[in-house]
């Protein structure tokens, strides 16, 4: 994928064409082999800088084994529908900085449950060539029937009569999450992996730890601590 020049407000028509081209690269297909590691990725903002983090988990023990982060100016200004172009390059770099390449990504955001079928999980999956799942706390598109109250209950998320994900109850009597495949995985597999990595909380453990780690780095940055070795050059 060609890099996007940072800090430049793009031509929206060109950006939309780029998004449509990349969306054609998304492949929803069964996993090739059983993943052994999974990385949660998330981003936070500290002033004008983005904090992009990746936390690698061992899937068998569901324990963190590595983590990395990048601090940089966002690649683009915020443009509705194009969040992945703002955060994706930095999150991808955080994943690349992990000591081991993950077998699977769980992304705090959407996969194909997106107006253009190209959410943040799709962007990262395509750019990195890694199976990716979007696990969002709120719906972006689509309609659904509320799943039953028990953990593991799910219903399809439908957009224009197309199944774009699942509405999944990861904890009994707690609000569901919106799971959608991003790349190289099916809806059913994405649901199974989210349930497998959820341990007593609403969100998967890799996603929770990525959120916590991003908040920690943000707090330290705002307190004036320097991380010059992790900042991307403008």
Swiss-Prot record:
It comes from the Bacteria. Its EC number is 3.1.21.7. GO terms for cellular component: cytoplasm. The record marks 78 as: Interaction with target DNA. InterPro entries: Endonuclease-V. Keywords: Cytoplasm, DNA damage, DNA repair, Endonuclease, Hydrolase, Magnesium, Metal-binding, Nuclease. One of its GO terms (biological process) is DNA repair. It is found in: Cytoplasm. One of its GO terms (molecular function) is RNA endonuclease activity, producing 5'-phosphomonoesters. It catalyses: Endonucleolytic cleavage at apurinic or apyrimidinic sites to products with a 5'-phosphate. Mg(2+) binds at residues 42, 108. It is an enzyme of class 3 (hydrolase). Gene3D superfamilies: archaeoglobus fulgidus dsm 4304 superfamily. Its cofactor is Mg(2+). PANTHER family: ENDONUCLEASE V. DNA repair enzyme involved in the repair of deaminated bases. Selectively cleaves double-stranded DNA at the second phosphodiester bond 3' to a deoxyinosine leaving behind the intact lesion on the nicked DNA. Belongs to the endonuclease V family. This is Endonuclease V. It comes from Geotalea uraniireducens (strain Rf4) (Geobacter uraniireducens).
